[in-house]
Amino acid sequence: MTDAASVATRIRRAYEDFLSGGNPPADAVRSIVRDSWARSLTGGVDPSDATPNGDRASTMSPAEFAAYRAAHPITAVRPLVQSLMVDAIADTGVVVALTDQSGRLLWIEGDSAARDRAGHIDFVEGSVWSEEVVGTNAPGLALAVDRSVQVVGPEHFAGPVQEWSCAAAPVHDPLTGHVIGVIDVTGGREVAAPFALAAVRSVVAAVEREAAGEVAPRRRLAILI
């Protein structure tokens, strides 16, 4: 058994132990994941269901979603994300997602086959992937703890999502410091590698630098006025 397979087996056993009411060993699963599992369970997330409760259909019409997405501040960074990341992963089995501050998926781009597969778990534009809605996952956890995170296979709370791995990091407004959304990479085993999280962090850093550069002249003008 490879090291990766051994780790996955250990995590899966811890997950099953946790769901059955047990207390997995501290070294069986990362504390950030264990805490997220606990919040997911307490919040009533069904571990057997990966569908985000029909939220995209119940709260926004297609026209409302299109208008909301177009006006959302994270949409302004989409061209930079495309040039830094999306173009490079076109046929790699990976997708890149941009969410809003609530975990709603605003844009999903990348490998078309991977997008089709992701649709089976409702990882589609318009659906909500917050921790409260779908349980432990990288976009939702990044929003919950306001830091970059990687969630690998059986670390996901919803069983149907456990064939996927994801890495995500929050994007902050340069003026307020508030989180405006998340940049996420989702795929298979390749996203379980450390470089996936490093790549997301690098892209978010570039996005926040560019946003800060655009804000600086407005700050100086405000001071002069």
Regions found by a protein language model. Name each.
Residues 1-130, 141, 150, 163, ...:
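Intrinsically disordered, low-complexity terminal regulatory regions
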Residues 85-86, 139-140, 155, 169-172:
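A generic local secondary-structure boundary/capping motif
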Residues 101, 145, 153-155, 169, ...:
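Fold-independent oxyanion-binding glycine-rich loops
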Residues 131-136, 142-157:
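Short loop/turn segments at beta-alpha junctions that line or gate ligand-sensing/allosteric surfaces
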Residues 161-170:
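A short beta-strand signature within small-molecule sensing/ligand-binding domains used
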